[in-house]
């Protein structure tokens, strides 16, 4: 309901998960992706549209998570419902305005793997925060030594069919309990 309001929106905020929309319902989303306006995506948005995503740019079908957001859910990198996540700010991005005032990120959700093992975040993405899986579900639990930190927040630029660049921010944390973290609220 209300998807028609996306046409006049100045920002699209997505917190979707495996939505299947009719051609008529998905049209405003595709039109927005061509608008050059910013996109803000939270947690499961990277697998928000798995079915019926009829969007093509330069003759190539667009994969929403991978192409638009910079990474799609591939697996739980942490132990699902057993680990929690400590956010680690990327040193080289300390001056980024998105990180201004962000000091402590922690959440009970686990880290998502958004690219194949042995690879990295796509080159057109700028990692802002890495997520270190912890060995439990408490703020002060130790890092899981068997799990490397993976990007959990990044920016990129998306260019749709009209050639208009759009700024994209994606954070793979974002469950309700994650937002008890003042650092994550500040980031998002």
Each predicted region: which residue ranges?
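Short, intrinsically disordered, charge-balanced linker/junction segments flanking boundaries
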Residues: 1, 184-188
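Aromatic-Pro/Gly-enriched surface loop or interdomain linker
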Residues: 1-10
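A glycine-rich, often tryptophan-bearing local segment used as a flexible ligand/cofactor-contacting loop or short
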Residues: 14, 19-101
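Acidic-and-aromatic substrate-binding clefts and catalytic sites of carbohydrate-active enzymes
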Residues: 19-23, 144-145, 179
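A short acidic/glycine-rich loop-to-helix N-cap element
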Residues: 175-185
């Amino acid at each position: 309901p209300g998807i028609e309001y996306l046409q006049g929106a100045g920002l699209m905020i997505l917190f979707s998960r495996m939505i299947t929309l009719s051609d008529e319902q998905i049209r405003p989303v595709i039109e927005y992706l061509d608008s050059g306006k910013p996109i803000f995506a939270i947690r499961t948005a990277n697998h928000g549209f798995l079915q019926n995503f009829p969007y093509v740019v330069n003759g190539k079908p667009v994969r929403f998570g991978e192409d638009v957001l910079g990474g799609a859910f591939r697996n739980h990198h942490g132990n699902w419902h057993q680990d929690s996540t400590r956010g680690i700010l990327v040193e080289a991005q300390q001056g980024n305005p998105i990180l201004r005032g962000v000091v402590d990120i922690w959440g009970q959700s686990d880290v998502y793997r958004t690219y194949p093992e042995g690879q990295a975040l796509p080159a057109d993405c700028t990692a802002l925060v890495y997520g270190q899986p912890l060995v439990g579900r408490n703020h002060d639990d130790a890092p899981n030594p068997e799990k490397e930190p993976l990007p959990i927040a990044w920016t990129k630029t998306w260019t749709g069919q009209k050639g208009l660049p759009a700024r994209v921010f994606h954070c793979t944390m974002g469950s309700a309990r994650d937002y008890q973290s003042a650092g994550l609220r500040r980031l998002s």
